[in-house]
Amino acid sequence: ERIGVVARRVAVVTYHAWRDMKHSDGVKVTMVERAIDLGVRKPSADEVAAAKQMLAKAADPKRLKMDEIYAQETVRIDDYPDTVNVKLQALRVGELGIVAIPCEVFAEIGLEIKSRSPLKSTFVIALANGYNGYLPSPAQHELGGYETWRSGWSYLETEASTKIIETTLEMLGVLAKGTRSGGN
């Protein structure tokens, strides 16, 4: 019953938005792509040794406890390269900007890109062109929620979001000016 109410409301709002849309021919579509290198938060030799010791003592290696899972991740991350290459894209469709980031982007990061974009409207697509884990802000790293714990799903340097924000805003700036300079 409740789902029917919600579905009808969504349908009505969608219909009104569609009906009131301004359609136009010949909308310009442009795109800029850049790849940037970001650091990997690697464990120290002591952290790896402690993780291996914990795993050696695990009661059931097939059913690890949470701290043992993170120990396993510490060992795995030690084998990662020191940097990873991350593909970023920015598209312009008319006055709309679209940013594609291969991470689970925190809301505050997407909102910052939207608010600082030189284009009239901008939205962010997360988990695009790959997967590089969570993308917390430096402030979130300081708070230390599970999304920041070093693992295969959170391994980028603590300043990764800052670098991604600045790079995508530069890309949107290129698109807003209608030039192709600065893109790959």
Predicted regions and their residues:
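Non-catalytic substrate/cofactor recognition surfaces at enzyme active-site rims
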Residues: 1-184
